Amino acid sequence: MSEFQLVTRFDPAGDQPEAIRLMVEGIEAGLSHQTLLGVTGSGKTFSIANVIAQVQRPTLVLAPNKTLAAQLYGEFKSFFPNNAVEYFVSYYDYYQPEAYVPSSDTFIEKDASINDHIEQMRLSATKALLERKDAIIVTTVSCIYGLGSPETYLKMVLHVDRGDKLDQRALVRRLADLQYTRNDMDFARATFRVRGDVIDIYPAESDLEAIRIELFDDEVESISAFDPLTGEVIRKLPRFTFYPKSHYVTPRETLLDAIEGIKVELQERLEYLRNNNKLVEAQRLEQRTRFDLEMILELGYCNGIENYSRYLSGRPAGAAPPTLYDYLPADALLVIDESHVSVPQVGAMYKGDRSRKETLVEYGFRLPSALDNRPMRFDEWEGVSPQTIFVSATPGNYEAEHAGRVIEQVVRPTGLVDPQVEVRPALTQVDDLLSEITKRVAVEERVLVTTLTKRMAEDLTDYLADHGVRVRYLHSDIDTVERVEIIRDLRLGTFDVLVGINLLREGLDMPEVSLVAILDADKEGFLRSERSLIQTIGRAARNLNGRAILYADRITGSMERAIGETERRRDKQIAFNLANGITPKGVFKDVADIMEGATVPGSRSKKRKGMAKAAEENAKYEAELRSPSEITKRIRQLEEKMYQLARDLEFEAAAQMRDEIAKLRERLLAV
């Protein structure tokens, strides 16, 4: 059996050794809940990685959003390169659920755009849980939504061993049952091609390898893994297991049973609607449901088949849906990152989904059984959650009530202490902020400013820009990828000040930021609560000169508690440093790191690392260019590379080349 192998050049330091020891002790003692109260920059992920390596248990890591999940995936991947670190998030790039608005008699059809790469990673995650003990799955709240049951899923898998008696046509039929499609021209994921007695199959969960099965008469003569691009054989295999293309694939006999159950419910519902004089609703329901049944009978699936999941999984009415938790082994571990955000998210999902579906059922768009296609309720989630570690700098009330043990990780391995917090009058906040920004820009440090409203952020950005400050702002209209680009540009020094509202909190890792300014800090509410203030102040904790300024006319209870907690942590950190002769060291982190985590992870990560390295080399080379002829020659070379990268569909690398060319053209004009 594979074991977790932690690969790192660091040893636990600061509060980490004690935190790791206590967490391991708690897990082995059977504690159902523990809380790791770890400040920003204290290495919480590293501590959790050490715990996983010591207890040797498969782990589910729950993050509050895709960006943080991707960062954690990247970190765990680097800590456990020889183990199965997987990524399970929603595979929708865009999702519009079906809905009905009675007031305007408007029905909105379900519309979605599925990210093929993330779908592959989800399949890879469940495969890892079913086949391996050394699995770490990084997920979001997506894990509480319905998934095909593992029992049904496993019934559909296809095992092929070398030496098996296997008819070619039978193999092709089984692949079709798994929803694989034959395509001899375009060999892509979840397809197969047949060339005589050689069958090439591209597994649905694979991103790197395809499988070649060679038959001699009706016997499997050879199984090999090969590169689907070059055709090069990577290795010979004694056996291989093919998993279905979708988690919702169902055996034929189960489908037939489900159809009978749906027909019975349809008749009961039609009778109810007609008896209540809802003839339009009855006609609509009958037409839609019979069309779906015909599709299921002929093709094995239909659009919106998840609405019949109760029958497909054989569950009684009202039972919890099968989810990713059903794939977890009994000895699994659950780690909830930024638990003060993640736990309330889990509780919020059920009610919103229920409200929308009840309207669809009432007006004849869906059968009542569609209500069972839902996320888990909070009490159901609590019932299936394994031993849990909450991880947060500001644990919430739920963690306080449930944690059997609270473990503090306040002292950072780098010796860095929490930023000094200062309260200044709100009356002159903008002018005072401008003078503070000028000081920081002079020493090439960055500044974060958080405001209360979008309008305020825009006005402040305009004001600072008018005074010569290189500034940008973040708001809810900016998508995740662009948000990451903005943070990257701030770190690179493309601009010096970033203004935001509620986006400058969890998960922003920016060692270059030395000042956090919180405007109108005395306006009590969600954005100025104790937890929000502590999280925002923590953004300056990775810099040696970190400082936070709260602009307020009075000190609120939230401010007092946030400042008090920051001072308590700061005193403990300074005392530890003095007792152990530690001199604080600033954090220097590669700017490419944030992009590694925040873009969709996968097999192309090596290419991205190479891309970042190439960009660095380009930058060094560009600095050495002097004459206009040298610059012009370099522009031509880069343009050729850019067009080649675009032809190879390497658009991220091509975009970097484009930016380099733009900089060189500016230099050419200045020469």
Curated annotation (Swiss-Prot):
Instruction: For this entry, list what GO says about its biological process.
Output: nucleotide-excision repair; SOS response
**Any idea which UniProt keywords this protein has?**
ATP-binding, Cytoplasm, DNA damage, DNA excision, DNA repair, Excision nuclease, Nucleotide-binding, SOS response
Transmembrane residues, as ranges? none
- Where's the UVR domain? 632-667
Q: Which Gene3D superfamilies match?
A: 6.10.140.240, P-loop containing nucleotide triphosphate hydrolases (3.40.50.300), UVR domain (4.10.860.10)
Q: Which SUPFAM superfamilies does the record match to this protein?
A: C-terminal UvrC-binding domain of UvrB (SSF46600), P-loop containing nucleoside triphosphate hydrolases (SSF52540)
Provide GO CC annotations from the record: cytoplasm; excinuclease repair complex
Which residues belong to any copy of the Helicase C-terminal domain? Answer: 429-582
- Key word DNA damage present: yes
Record motif Beta-hairpin, residues = 91-114
What subcellular compartments does it reside in? Cytoplasm
Q: List, for all copies, the residue spans of the domain called Helicase ATP-binding.
A: 25-412
Single annotated GO MF: ATP binding
CDD domains, sorted: DEXHc_UvrB, SF2_C_UvrB
Quote the PROSITE patterns the UniProt record gives: HELICASE_ATP_BIND_1, HELICASE_CTER, UVR
Role: The UvrABC repair system catalyzes the recognition and processing of DNA lesions. A damage recognition complex composed of 2 UvrA and 2 UvrB subunits scans DNA for abnormalities. Upon binding of the UvrA(2)B(2) complex to a putative damaged site, the DNA wraps around one UvrB monomer. DNA wrap is dependent on ATP binding by UvrB and probably causes local melting of the DNA helix, facilitating insertion of UvrB beta-hairpin between the DNA strands. Then UvrB probes one DNA strand for the presence of a lesion.
Q: What is known of its domains?
A: The beta-hairpin motif is involved in DNA binding.
Which family does the record assign?
Belongs to the UvrB family.
Q: What is annotated about its quaternary structure and interactions? A: Forms a heterotetramer with UvrA during the search for lesions. Interacts with UvrC in an incision complex.
This chain's protein is named: UvrABC system protein B
The protein's organism comes out as Pseudomonas fluorescens (strain Pf0-1)
Source taxonomy: Bacteria, Pseudomonadati, Pseudomonadota, Gammaproteobacteria, Pseudomonadales
